[in-house]
Amino acid sequence: MSPVKLIVVFAACLALLAANSPSSGPPLLMERSAPSDLEITGMAAGVTPGTVRYISYERLLTLPQTTVTVTGDDNFRELPQQKLAVTGVYLDVLESSLRALPGSDLLIALCSDGYRATYPRDYVKIHRPILALKINGLPVETWVARTHSDDPGAYFITHAGFTPSFSVLSFQEIPKIPAKVTRLEFGTSQQVYGAISPHQRDAANPQVIDGFRIAQQHCFRCHNLGSYGGTKAGKPWQTLGSFASSSPAIFERYLRDPKSVDPKSTMSCDPQLGEPAAKALQAYFQTFATTPH
């Protein structure tokens, strides 16, 4: 056989192998095949706007994985001395594997309890968050059934380690480690964070800007403005705005010790929240009491 024919045959064989490879082709399903399927929405190839696609746990296992040792994850607070070997997929690898569209620069993790975590590109690059698939070599649900008292769900996001990359006044960046993740949505920072950006007339107020930066990192996880942000707290942005405007002293107490104001609150206490940070949050949220955004 001539060299040219050999090259053609070899190329054809490679193409056939690629076509039959479990990682080739679109990985998304049109319909749910199992309760453990992860929902995918937004700006990804093969996802029509407004629709939901699915990726199975088995399919996720075919993606490039990493195994890291995790300590200090608040989802496992009752195991403070135990190091966990977590196997999963880096979010940036997941984005490329699911073929996020070029305009997408934000990944949003939605959880069954209404919590949401937003991952802009700089966070993903600096902190390398991981979608966990296994703990100590076991599927998360299997490991939980054997060893753990608090269920993080089929999917959670964690880090090998976390060091804050910035601070706003006394507020330090905190890790985004959602549990019970049911959906990943690809979107844009401009659209999502734009919903809670300060009004143009307040854009030059440094106190409002500081409050926005803190709220964007922290409050947005459990409080929503329309379809953006989390719903876990049951208190939307406008409610916080009215609260900050009408009862600033109580609002500040809510920031430091939420259960003293709302016994049903699941928000963690922050008794060390500095006065400038608390005032910045007040100033920012007060703009939502009367100003349409």
What are these regions (language model features)?
Residues S21-D210, Q217, Y228, P236, ...:
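N-terminal intrinsically disordered, low-complexity segments enriched in P/E/S/T
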Residues Q238-T291:
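Extracytoplasmic electron-transfer domains, predominantly the class I c-type cytochrome c fold
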Residues A12, T290-H293:
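Long, contiguous alpha-helical scaffold regions
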Residues S104, C219, K232, D262-K264:
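Short secondary-structure junction motifs
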Residues F212, F220, N224-Y254:
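Gly/Gly-Pro-rich "capping" loops immediately C-terminal to redox-active cysteine motifs
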Residues M1-L6:
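Positively charged n-region of N-terminal signal peptides that target proteins for export
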Residues V89-V93, I209-F220, A249, R253, ...:
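Solvent-exposed, polar/charged alpha-helical surfaces in well-ordered, non-transmembrane soluble domains
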Residues I7-L17:
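Bacterial N-terminal signal peptides
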